[in-house]
A protein has these predicted regions:
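Soluble non-cytosolic domains of exported or imported proteins
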Residues: 100-105, 126-129, 192, 222-230, ...
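Solvent-exposed loop/turn segments at secondary-structure junctions
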Residues: 92-96, 127-131, 150-154, 167-168, ...
Length: 341
């Protein structure tokens, strides 16, 4: 459900946290200008991020109109290095009450892991609505998130993207379904066990002169190889429709082994780069799905972070943090440090 809010003369279309879902077959609303999630943060974002866009345009125009008489034969200032961006992909394991490994037991461990890691972007998978609110609370006031349930609205699992509001401002975002009818809510036409989605966000980097980039976050099906391959093809097609001048970061649980699955080959064949392979420095590798069992060194990776060419990966790690033998999830989060230019 969406509500039209007017604040400071700005009209915003905002998702209502009713949990209600549109009727089956409904077409997904155009979310491209919905830049934040619910409540007061939406209004604050409108007051902060929209003027940034106008200011950037004004500053650019003012610069080009500078009097020619001011030009002097001075040396050009050296280019400043791009600030590094820390990105994590993390399958949260959906919240449940079953023991062992209930959400109540895992939540404090996840809170501590995220507080230690502090990435600026976290692409998550499997999060349920209340679980996402818990993580939002635990991350604190400097983080926000964007996401839609795969059943529409706040229903069922999400591919929510968390981000540090001190560093990043969302410009636009969108969620589509991995099916033959991507704009139809809950659509599932490739034999997947569940509807599958991609949430992408176009961010402005406040620490890098307002430069923009995309993050696309997804969770491929665990049952159908056909669905995984079709999902990879559609994801590559949608990424190709992004502004080609902007960097792209892709996060996700792909339920496919890197280097061993056609879905992986499709995405890398489209020009994307596997940050784990490209990293200048790498931590130890494990199977990223461990199922709360002993970690498997040199195991297969189903959780990846990919980028467009030209992005530098300085370091890639898998976070093995646990407390008293309790892991925060049945997956290991993967984190990379990037320079987008």
């Amino acid at each position: 459900m969406f509500t039209l809010i007017t604040h400071l003369g700005i009209r915003l279309l905002v998702a209502r946290p009713s949990g209600l879902c549109p009727p089956e077959g409904a077409v997904v609303p155009n979310q491209r200008r919905v830049t934040r999630r619910l409540g007061l943060k939406v209004l604050l974002a409108a007051a902060v991020t929209l003027p940034l866009s106008s200011a950037a345009i004004t500053a650019s125009s003012a610069s080009s109109a500078a009097p020619r008489a001011r030009r002097t034969a001075t040396l050009a200032a050296p280019a400043t290095p791009a600030p590094r961006l820390d990105v994590m992909t993390f399958n949260l394991r959906y919240a449940d009450t079953a023991e062992p490994n209930s959400w109540a037991d895992r939540r404090p461990v996840m809170r501590e892991l995220l507080h230690r890691a502090r990435p600026q972007v976290i692409g998550t998978q499997e999060g349920l609505y209340q679980q996402l609110l818990d993580i939002d609370t635990d991350l604190g006031p400097h983080y926000d998130w964007i996401g839609t349930g795969r059943e529409g609205g706040s229903r069922d699992e999400s591919t929510a993207v968390y981000y540090d509001v001190r560093r990043l401002a969302p410009v636009e975002h969108y969620t589509f379904w991995l099916s033959d009818t991507p704009e139809v809510i809950r659509s599932n036409t490739w034999g997947a066990a569940f509807p599958r989605i991609v949430t992408w966000v176009r961010f402005r980097d406040l620490a890098d002169d307002g430069r923009e980039f995309y993050v696309a976050n997804t969770h491929f099906d665990q049952r159908s190889q056909y669905a995984r391959e079709r999902s990879a093809t559609l994801l590559a097609k949608r990424i190709a429709e992004f502004d080609p001048t902007l960097p792209v970061v892709v996060t996700g649980d792909f339920n496919a082994y890197a280097h061993k699955n056609p879905a992986y080959d499709t995405l890398l064949g489209s020009g994307l780069v596997d940050t784990w392979d490209a990293a200048e420095h790498r931590g130890p590798q494990y199977a990223t799905f461990h199922g709360y069992r002993r970690l498997k060194p040199d195991g297969d990776r189903i959780d990846w972070i990919l980028t467009s060419p030209g992005v530098t990966t300085h370091r890639a790690t898998m976070d093995t943090f646990s407390m008293h033998g309790q892991f925060p999830s049945d997956h290991l989060p993967v984190q990379v440090s990037l320079s987008l230019r």
